[in-house]
Amino acid sequence: MKVALETELTNANELMSERHFKVLAVASHPVQYMAPIFRRMAAEPQLDLHVAYCSLRGAEAAIDPDFATSVKWDVPLLQGYSWTAIPNKGSGNESFWGLNNPGLSNLIHDGKFDALLCFVGYVRASFWIARGAAKASGAAFLFGTDAHSLAPRDGKAWKVVFKKAFWPFLFRQADQVIVPSTGTFEMIKSLGIPDSSITLTPYTVDNDWWKAQAAMANRETTRANLGATSQQLIILFCAKLQPWKRPMDLLQAFAEAGPEGSILVFAGEGPQRPKLEAEAAKRGIQRRVKFLGFINQSQLPALYSAADVLVLPSVYEPFAVVVNEAMCCGCPVIVSDQVGAARDLVAPVNPEFIFPAGDIQALANLLRFAFTDRERLREAGRRGFAHVETHSPERLIAATVEAIRKAIEVLRHEK
């Protein structure tokens, strides 16, 4: 009897591994990083993918509150996969009711999906609409977080207390928790969620696109447009100019360590810009500090290729796919220890390029190293270029298919 039962379970698992899964991905809005992944998922033989958007911000021009400017990405966001825009009854702002898409319920019920991948945060009403509809329809429900600690962006202690109490309950709502990094995996595990309920689905970008675009870029032309010669060092900051990204730390470290021939480039917009401009003027380095404003996706590969090093000194950074992007373009990366990508992408190949967040002197020392040993800097870029393939779309999709399989198996055993 035991042998027969084991054989039955083995056969069921083999059938599950070969099964074609009908999947709905629920996303808050089109994102330039996810669109190519959705296209790849749509081409995956084991998946029948449909995407439901709660908003079309990003594909349509709209104010991005963090960039503090209107953003419309200049790469295809809605091509190559099946999608639906669900009417939003909410205001569209960042509040709980900002995304309120009751139409998700009918779509999920009528679609008879095997699984839902939810990319809407639990602080939005639409997350709970999707969760309720998945449960009612019998679909597996998968979601996660990119956070690698309980620390909130604004540092408020009550939020840590809340997360400690609520997050164990929250993540038990998932039939499988999907996480983008080792740090996130360990954080979810610390909440009491078992290993078997967590799948690492590594954050990635469209590596092939970034590498191809970088190969076509004219490095010297881009550098000349930035006012740099072939001998000058370009330090790049590519992110929103927000306090938690700590662009001021980089500016101050650059002012202390940067020789006359070096250039600091800020690619991004945000509320910190006036303070940065004032600080550069105060320190007398305004001619060596460039503010490019918001840079759209199609222009970024050339910028990474022109830079000698990317620096991200954030004190709060769940992951940072700019690290993936830069590595795909052969640009070495210096990051703080609070950047989620540090552990999986930077530490394995260039651990000396990680510094304690908020330590301006440590960052200045790393910049001095960059200025004085250009060949080691280039070698760091080559190592990063090779290592970023561990975070490829193929690996992400294979892991996602496995997570879906495990989630459906959990539901099957619960019935």
Task: Label each residue range with its predicted role.
Residues 362, 369, 376-390:
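A short, well-ordered alpha-helix in the C-terminal region of glycosyltransferases
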Residues 332-336:
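Short hydrophobic beta-strand element within catalytic cores of glycosyltransferases
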Residues 315:
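Aromatic "clamp/platform" in nucleotide-sugar-dependent glycosyltransferases that forms part
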